[in-house]
């Protein structure tokens, strides 16, 4: 599978890369989301308007450390996420007012078998090891 860059649903903007995906909740409601690919984020994040629109409910709460060292507690749920490069079921942080834009974190990338190349700013299929 070739690397996916311009022309393959990754949008670039001065050192920042985005990918468009579709999230689906447990009742089948869907939303199209433009995710910031954030290889520094563990979990993906959905804004409150999106997760409420697709009918997600909190399953548990987790503590997170932000880039500035601040700790926050956020609810976490799960949804189906489809990208042009693959799809699967993934945990997502349920964003609160004032939280970041939609983020695509490394747990989701690993679940989908993808890795982000920060130098070329493209998604590649992951080279999986079976050991």
Region spans (language model):
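Pepsin/retropepsin-fold aspartyl endopeptidases
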Residues: 1-131
